[in-house]
Amino acid sequence: MKKSLLGLTFASLMFSAGSAVAADYKIDKEGQHAFVNFRIQHLGYSWLYGTFKDFDGTFTFDEKNPAADKVNVTINTTSVDTNHAERDKHLRSADFLNTTKYPQATFTSTSVKKDGDELDITGDLTLNGVTKPVTLEAKLIGQGDDPWGGKRAGFEAEGKIKLKDFNIKTDLGPASQEVDLIISVEGVQQK
């Protein structure tokens, strides 16, 4: 009887520990709960904001073990939108994103580290045919049950990339060499 009770207790502990491990989430872009935005200075006088309207992604989140976290995102670069059709056409050209040749950008995390209240998500960003490491500083906004019987987790992340690192050589002046990435995602836990 002792062995059976011990085995049952051990199995219960393993099941409980298993439910606290990493969970897989699909980014909820269909419900408009996810955004991949950017901004760049315009000639050093103002900020120009834009977004990518078409992207898909998943992430794995384990609050107790960030090293187990993973992020994978694919962006349709032709979906760039700065609220100005002529500028968007120029951004899709070979001067910038070269979407005819490189219609997708991808981000695949390689490590996640906890830094106080933030997560440093380092990964490989492939943009314009070039792959470079990029680190995003992310913060958990919230997590828990949703009204439809599911679970959700939301994050906001920021990072910077240099245009020249991704073979974008158009010179918009010294104040316009870096792009700020501003990303907000809500994920629906997969069962």
UniProtKB/Swiss-Prot annotation:
Pfam families: YceI (PF04264). Coiled coil: none annotated. Residues 1-22 form the signal peptide. Its main location: periplasm. PANTHER family: PROTEIN YCEI. HAMAP family: UPF0312. This is Protein YceI. It comes from Shigella flexneri. The lineage of its organism: Bacteria, Pseudomonadati, Pseudomonadota, Gammaproteobacteria, Enterobacterales.
